[in-house]
Amino acid sequence: MVHNELHALDLAIIGAYLIAMVLIGLVVVKKVRSMDDYYLGGRSFGPLVLMATVCATIIGGSGLMGRAGVAYSSGFKAIMTALPYLLGMFIFSGLAGRISDVGTKFGVTSIPDLFEQRFGKTAKVVLGCLIAFTMMGTVASQVTATATIINMLGGEIGISYELGALIACAVFIIYTATSGLFGVIYTDVFQFVMLILFVYILIPASSLVKLGGIGNFVQNLAPELAKPYIDGGIVGDIITYFVFTLAGAEMWQWAFAAKNRRSAKEGLFLGTLAYGLTIPLVWFMGVVAHQLVPAEKIAAYGSTDAVVPALAIEILPVGLTGLALAGILSVIMSTADSYLIVSVQTCVHDIYKVFRPDTPERKELRLTRVFAVVLPLGALLIALYIKNAYNILMFAWSFYAAAAGLPAFAALYWKKATKAGVLSGMAAGFTVTIAWKLLGQPFGLGATVPGAIACALALVLVSLATCKKHPSVYLDPRKA
């Protein structure tokens, strides 16, 4: 029986899921014997495991709930902004083999590590600070999405958005702080299965059954929700997504964590392919909610982020509702844990150890667990201030994409890139992005566009002017 509200069984299923995630983290902690285990899982992951974690992570709370909310309010924009990220990820999967080779041959474990070996410690710290800021913002977007779901339970058991955010942080902290990337990867595989079965198959299929078939959906679809269009804001989002894929710290970490070059390329490619198949389904869930969920219910939740869980509650019977909401939580948590582990690595390995290079490994492991507690609290503050997952994500990514995307690509491939060029590019990209936002984004153009252009100009011109007098070390994994 469809019930239009949450039943005790649904709540029990959601609670059991959250407990299972914590237990996985506590069990897998036994595998963590070194920092290489904590950060990279011992470089031991094959293509299928990487496929699951890549797909689950890049969808995320903002990619599912946030983008479905965009589809609900703006229709085809949800697809227009997803396709550049998909294209960028396919391109990145082609780079993943080289990244894996560089990591294995030169002992590189992160993008800042690569920057240090090519451009020195200053470049490493600057990039590390950019990554830490971006990852915290991304974790905050997942806290917001999780809190939105838990807040939807508030009418049943009295949990507010704020308390939901605290619960989300607590779960993220426990299994990430204890088990590192091992815990992240193994929970991601479980979460991937939950996501595909109970979100991307169950909810769309049940929606069509409820409507009486695809014909009725098309007949009642508002034309403006299916009409492609583009404006300056969408262009900004497109550039942000595309450039971000070149320097997404979590994506580089997956390549470094692969057991070999082939696993890195295949895992990234298959995960991206699986993600691509979900894009039209997210749009469908966003727009079909207009036909199945009363508008006042969406409005009552206070955010269009609530569209997909509201749809699940509206159309699914007892038990399946709990599984669907657990599936939605799974994709959010998959993204949060991946970005959290990257932010922890950045703060401890890429920033702290620059100033304390002789830190013993045992102390470094303790510090990672301290930061795995502290950083989510910073994300919590952001989530309490900005309660829209998509807005938080685009705010954080715009700065990073403009300032770090092209320098990261240059560090991997361009022999003539120099320390001065990379630092100039990052400074120009970050500064112009801030200035453009402060000016109110003239012409309606997203800030990443002028920021990325400024970064490219500074990077290329300064590097060409300084490469002869101050060449950088080029890391070529093909040379013995």
Ranges and model annotations:
Residues M1-A480:
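Membrane-embedded helix-loop-helix hairpins and adjacent transmembrane boundary segments
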